């Protein structure tokens, strides 16, 4: 086992990794920007090193600064968390060259899955179902039109190098294609420094389903089942749950076995998430793979009793899957997670500032992952996520009731949060009945006369 790990992240996920380190008897080293000097991840780490000013490019995304901190602290490994440098293959390579273990997959696999059209090709070759679409990068809007005619409208053009809805456009007819193609290309180039696009058939009213896997460095891959992530706004997830009401036990087993075989074939290791769109006929189509721990990993932890972050660390330290899991995966009950963001619940504008009161809920089956606290300051420089409220219950109905109760008891004052939005979602009849898709939030907000 490692003696010391540096966490190349901040706030909630950094604190989550620190908890795992402490339980494994590993010393945790935090890094922080000047804006995060009073953050809880700094307080609870065994060591903490300031790596620069508040701006991401000068601190958390500054690879030389992060590696320098790791060398100063003499760490064995680096855990990247999610976001920031977590899926940066160059960062993983620099860790390797510096003699520091990167807690994640090999750089070449991260790079493969980061180039979306190559990931599609690799998964198609391995037998994973994908949507009809282009083969490789599309060079021009003329070539895009040729593919669109083959696939059939509507289609969606996507940035090869990115995600989160940027560099993405839905095209419903031939007349729209040139303008939307150029707009997606420009947005992708601005967001990711790479304007490459590919195309897929667009699925109307899909669900967003993802599967969690763990793979050791000895060839063993295990599926931990799926998460339902369809409640999202502008491709940003708001609420997740496990299991999905639309995935049967037979589907769960079939897809899980297929993914384990596919990932073993490409030499994948550590935690990973494979994302799918589900069409109206409940067929799953691969869209991308995230080669890191996900924000929403707690819902899987709650229904499987597997600590995914501790598993990541153990796998990176060379443990075999039989020692990591200590038995077969068994799913119990239902879990829901609400992302609490520092945003106006109707306008969705960021809400930085001092938290004047903070009282997270408790009780049976309730978990709160957060680095926020009373009198703490939410800086304006970073992602708006301040807490994740997670519940577990015997079934979905009880989980909804428990989450509703927990939201009512979650006090955050001094800043706006999305807690009121989550209360309204949990009370919605369609949500409670499981009648939703990725367009649910837009329809929900339009129905209530709120902003989208």
Regions found by a protein language model. Give the residues of each.
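ATP-dependent carboxylate activation and anion-phosphoryl transfer catalytic cores
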Residues: 7-26, 48-50, 71-73, 89, ...
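A generic structural signal for short coil/turn motifs at secondary-structure boundaries
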Residues: 57-58, 110, 167, 297-299
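Acidic/histidine-enriched active-site and ligand-binding environments that engage anionic O-linkages
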Residues: 147-156
């Amino acid at each position: 086992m490692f003696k010391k790990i540096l966490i190349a992240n901040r706030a909630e996920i950094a604190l989550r990794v620190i908890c795992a380190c402490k339980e494994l008897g590993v010393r945790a080293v935090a890094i922080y920007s000047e804006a995060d000097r009073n953050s809880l991840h700094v307080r609870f780490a065994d060591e903490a090193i300031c790596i620069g000013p508040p701006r991401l490019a000068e601190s958390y995304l500054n690879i030389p600064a992060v590696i320098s901190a790791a060398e100063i602290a003499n760490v064995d490994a680096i855990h990247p968390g999610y976001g920031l440098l977590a899926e940066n293959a160059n960062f993983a390579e620099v860790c390797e060259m510096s003699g520091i273990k990167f807690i994640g997959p090999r750089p070449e696999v991260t790079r493969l899955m980061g180039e979306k059209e190559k990931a599609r090709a690799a998964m198609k070759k391995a037998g994973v179902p994908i949507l009809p679409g282009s083969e490789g990068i599309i060079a021009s809007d003329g070539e895009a039109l040729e593919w669109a005619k083959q696939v059939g409208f509507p289609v969606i053009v996507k940035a090869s190098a990115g995600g989160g809805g940027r560099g993405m456009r839905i095209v419903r007819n031939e007349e729209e294609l040139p303008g939307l193609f150029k707009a997606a290309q420009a947005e992708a180039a601005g967001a990711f420094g790479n304007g490459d696009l590919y195309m897929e058939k667009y699925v109307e009213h899909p669900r967003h389903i993802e599967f969690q896997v763990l793979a050791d460095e000895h060839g063993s891959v295990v599926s931990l089942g799926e998460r339902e992530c369809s409640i999202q706004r502008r491709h940003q997830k708001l609420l997740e749950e496990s299991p999905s009401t639309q995935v049967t036990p037979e589907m769960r087993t079939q897809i899980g076995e297929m993914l384990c075989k596919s990932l073993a074939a490409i030499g994948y290791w550590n935690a990973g998430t494979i994302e799918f769109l589900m069409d109206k006929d409940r067929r799953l189509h691969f869209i991308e793979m995230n080669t890191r721990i996900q924000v929403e990993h707690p819902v899987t932890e709650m229904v499987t009793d597997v600590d995914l972050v501790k598993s990541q660390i153990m796998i990176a330290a060379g443990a075999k899957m039989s020692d990591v899991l200590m038995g077969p995966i068994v799913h119990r009950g239902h879990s829901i997670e609400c992302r609490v963001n520092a945003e106006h619940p109707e306008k969705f504008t960021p809400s930085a500032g001092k938290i004047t009161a903070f009282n997270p809920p408790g009780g049976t089956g309730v978990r709160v992952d957060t680095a926020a606290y009373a009198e703490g300051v939410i800086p304006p420089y970073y992602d708006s996520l301040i807490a994740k409220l997670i519940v577990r219950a015997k079934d979905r109905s009880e989980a909804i009731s428990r989450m509703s109760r927990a939201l009512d008891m979650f006090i955050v004052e001094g800043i706006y949060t999305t807690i009121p939005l989550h209360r309204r979602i949990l009370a919605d009849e369609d949500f409670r009945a499981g009648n939703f898709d990725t367009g649910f939030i837009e329809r929900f907000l339009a129905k209530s006369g709120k902003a989208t």
